[in-house]
C-alpha cells in the first residue's frame, strides 16, 4: 500500500510537470514571430468599414491584440483595457483583431466594453496566421519603427501590466 501511494504521487507530479512544460512549450511553438523581429504587415477591415494596414501606423507605438469574443481571458483583458483607458489617456495605438468571427459578434464585444480603439475582423484567421497558430488573447507590442518589443500569450494581469508599462515607456 505504501509503495502504491508513492507510485501514484510520482505519477501525479510527473503528469503535472509535463502539463506545465507542455503549456509553455506550446506557447513558444505556436508563436511565429519573436521580439526583435519586424511585425508582419497586413491589411484589416475595421468595424467602421475602413481598411487599415499595419504599416500605416509606422511612427507610432502599437499594441496589437488578437482576440476571440468567446474567450473568457479576452473578456478579462478587455475589462482591464477599458479600465485603463478610462483612468488615463492612452498615448499609443491599440489595434484589436477578432480572429475567425463575424462582424456582428465583434461589434457586440466592442460595445460591451465601450471600446474606442480600432477593432478589426479576421474572419479566415489569415492575419492571425502570420503571428501565431493558436492561443488568444495574444498581444504584440510594436515600436514606432515596426519592431516587436514584447508579447504576451493568454491573459495574465501582471504580464499585461508589464507590457502596458513598456508601451508607455516607448512613447516617452
Question: PLM features: residue spans?
Answer:
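Short pre-active-site segment immediately N-terminal to redox-active cysteine/selenocysteine motifs
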Residues: 60-62, 67-70, 135
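Short, internal strand/loop/helix patches
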Residues: 95, 107-145
Amino acid at each position: 500500500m505504501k509503495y502504491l501511494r508513492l507510485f501514484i504521487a510520482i505519477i501525479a507530479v510527473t503528469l503535472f510537470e509535463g502539463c506545465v512544460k507542455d503549456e509553455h512549450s506550446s506557447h513558444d511553438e505556436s508563436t511565429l514571430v519573436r521580439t526583435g523581429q519586424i511585425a508582419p504587415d497586413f491589411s484589416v477591415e475595421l468595424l467602421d468599414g475602413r481598411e487599415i494596414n499595419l504599416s500605416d501606423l509606422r511612427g507610432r507605438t502599437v499594441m496589437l491584440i488578437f482576440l476571440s469574443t468567446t474567450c473568457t481571458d479576452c473578456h478579462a483583458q478587455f475589462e482591464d483595457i477599458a479600465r485603463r483607458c478610462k483612468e488615463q489617456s492612452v498615448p499609443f495605438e491599440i489595434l484589436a483583431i477578432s480572429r475567425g468571427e463575424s462582424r456582428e459578434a465583434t461589434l457586440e464585444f466592442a460595445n460591451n466594453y465601450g471600446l474606442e480603439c480600432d477593432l478589426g475582423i479576421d474572419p479566415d484567421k489569415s492575419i492571425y496566421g502570420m503571428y501565431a497558430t493558436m492561443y488568444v488573447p495574444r498581444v504584440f507590442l510594436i515600436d514606432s519603427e515596426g519592431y516587436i518589443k514584447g508579447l504576451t500569450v493568454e491573459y495574465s494581469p501582471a504580464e499585461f501590466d508589464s507590457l502596458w508599462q513598456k508601451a508607455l515607456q516607448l512613447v516617452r
